[in-house]
Structure formats: structure tokens, C-alpha cells
Regions:
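Active-site hotspot residues in diverse enzymes, especially metal/ion-binding acidic/histidine motifs
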Residues: 1-228
Length: 228
């Protein structure tokens, strides 16, 4: 699933798809020889962002994850039968896409994300959403993306532990108070703020003020706070 509004050119997209197909074809030959294929075929119906959030919790239940943080999402997805290819590129117009070829669920992510683990984890969770969510065909591209974004955030930051760490409803945010949340869930500061807004812990004004400050401080290129 490539995002239709991606800034990636058609030729660049096709090159990535071809490279990925070659990689997965070779990968599957090796698995055929070793008779080691695990098929990932989990689908959960949803038609709204609220149902997408519930689908994330349902998948956590199916995988016996409780509400604990996801320590290694890439390894978890591979253990469940999703094939992952890290495509070597510095082109930040591409972050990832997912597809199913010959019943094999596949995710391709950009190698530049390895320098930004919180972003990499959110991209993986977003592509997991596209593989898992069984959405109505008449939903718009934006609605598909909104559902995938909410699923990804809920999967990485379940409501109960997140709300407790965030401290309930807030009318101000201190950046340093978000660092423990970033470290615990392995997500970026903007992802935390968007999740807090989604859960009605902060309002529109506070969300907007945060992003103005975040951009002004240049945190998009060099975000403070450790991710462990």
C-alpha cells in the first residue's frame, strides 16, 4: 500500500517495487527449500478511526501482548510471518509501503529510518495497520490513512498506560515531561502529542502551540529526549 499523495515520483516508486519483488522472490526460494514459511493472514474489520483503534487492541490481545510496550516491532512482525525488507535509500520522500504477493505479507521500509527509531517504529506500525485492517472499499485515501495512523498509535501506545503516564487532561505541556513517555513507548514527541489529542487529554490550541514551538526549535531534525 503506497500512499497516493506520496511525494515519491512514479519512476522511483516502480524502482522500489521491482527491487522489493526481487528480494522477496529470493527470500521465498530460501524459505521453500527450508520449508519454513509462516503465513500472516490476520484481518480485522473496521470502518472508522474508532474501530481502527479497537482493532489495534484486538491484535494485541490475539498476540498476548497485554498493554506492555512493544520492545522490537520489526522482530515481532517477522515472528508473525510478515516479511520485511529494508530498502537502501536516503530519499526521505519514501518511508515505507506494504503489500501481499502470493499470500505473503510484505513490508518495505527505507534504510534512512534506521537513524530515527521512533519514526521507524511508527512507520512499521502504520504498514502493519494496512495489512491488518479490513476497511470498506469506498473509504477515501485520507480515511484509509487516518485509520492506519490511529491503529499504529493505539498499537504502540495503548490508552490506559499512555493516559496514566501523560497525567490525564492537561492545559500545558513541558517538553521535558514527555521524555519518559518517549523512552517508554519508543515514539516521537509529535506522536505523543497527537495521541494525547486523540484521547482528549489536550485541546486543539495546545496541540497547535506544541507544533509551532517544535518546528521553531528545529526539533524535527534533532529531537531531544532519549529512546531506549
Amino acid at each position: 500500500h503506497f500512499r497516493k499523495r506520496s511525494k515519491l515520483s512514479k519512476s522511483a516508486r516502480e524502482a522500489i517495487e521491482e527491487r522489493a519483488k526481487d528480494y522477496f522472490a529470493r527470500f521465498m526460494e530460501i524459505e521453500d527449500i527450508t520449508n519454513n514459511t509462516i503465513f500472516f493472514d490476520t484481518r480485522i474489520q473496521a470502518s472508522t478511526v474508532d474501530e481502527a483503534e479497537q482493532a489495534a487492541y484486538k491484535l494485541r490481545d490475539m498476540w498476548n501482548m497485554g498493554e506492555d510496550p512493544v520492545v522490537n516491532l520489526l522482530q515481532l512482525m517477522e515472528n508473525k510471518g510478515i516479511k520485511i525488507f529494508i530498502y537502501n535509500t536516503a530519499n526521505e520522500a519514501f518511508d515505507g509501503f506494504s503489500a501481499v504477493y502470493s499470500k505473503i505479507a510484505m513490508v518495505v521500509i527505507a534504510s534512512w529510518l534506521e537513524g530515527n527509531l521512533p519514526r521507524m517504529r511508527m512507520t512499521l506500525a502504520h504498514e502493519l495497520a494496512h495489512l491488518v485492517l479490513d476497511l470498506p472499499e469506498d473509504l477515501s485515501e485520507k480515511e484509509h490513512e487516518d485509520c492506519a495512523n490511529v491503529f499504529a498509535s493505539a498499537f504502540l501506545m495503548p490508552e490506559a498506560p499512555f493516559s496514566e503516564m501523560f497525567g490525564g487532561k492537561r492545559d500545558r505541556i513541558l517538553i521535558r515531561n514527555l521524555f519518559p513517555i518517549k523512552s517508554y513507548f519508543g515514539v516521537s514527541l509529535p506522536a505523543i502529542v497527537m495521541r494525547a489529542h486523540r484521547l482528549h487529554l489536550i485541546g486543539n490550541n495546545l496541540k497547535q502551540r506544541f507544533f509551532i514551538y517544535y518546528n521553531k526549535m528545529g526539533y524535527k531534525k534533532d529531537e531531544p529526549g532519549d529512546y531506549c
